[in-house]
A protein has these predicted regions:
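Short loop/helix-cap segments at secondary-structure boundaries that form the rim of catalytic
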Residues: 72-78, 124-127
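Phosphate-binding beta-loop-alpha motif at adenosine-nucleotide cofactor sites
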Residues: 127-142
Length: 155
């Protein structure tokens, strides 16, 4: 069955759109929470056995997985689509300043790191993504596009 990776920088709305997809009845996994990630040499990485097991599980509909880690590229062949979520920097910073439930992006050092990630990491994600989606529009529209991507990828 179809598996879609949703990736992107902090503040683009990955977790928010995942929550909306779950609300619509889709199976979702946010790898930022739980035991999906471990830190190796200071670098957050997916626990490969757990991700392999997740992607091997039978499922009735599409699976939407959210995450941005250095070893995600190893799993690209296992996903039917890799969707890079993006937003203008001012939108990202506004979201980071006003979000609740996640304090990352509140300090000047963290914002500087996110700026570097946008400059250095986002182009790498863009080069390997199958789709790019600007999340500055309505949440419902972003979720609808992701569902369409899953429908087409599963054919």
């Amino acid at each position: 069955m179809t598996a879609i990776l949703i990736t992107g920088m902090s503040g683009v709305g990955k977790s928010t759109v995942l929550t909306e997809l779950a609300r619509r009845g889709h199976e979702t996994v946010d790898t930022d929470y739980g035991d999906w990630i471990h830190v190796v040499g200071g670098e957050p990485l997916w626990r490969e056995e757990l991700i392999d097991n997740l992607l091997d599980r039978p499922r009735a509909g599409p699976l939407f997985v959210q995450g941005t880690v250095a070893n995600q590229v190893r799993f690209y062949p296992r996903f039917d689509a890799v969707v890079l979520l993006t937003a203008p920097r001012d939108v990202i910073f506004h979201r980071l300043r006003t979000r609740t439930g996640n304090d990352f992006g509140k300090t000047a050092d963290q914002l500087a790191r996110i700026s570097r990630d946008i400059e250095e990491t986002e182009p790498l994600l863009r080069a390997s993504a199958t789709h790019e989606l600007d999340t500055s529009g309505p949440l419902e529209s972003v979720a609808a596009v992701l569902v369409k991507i899953a429908e087409h990828a599963g054919r």
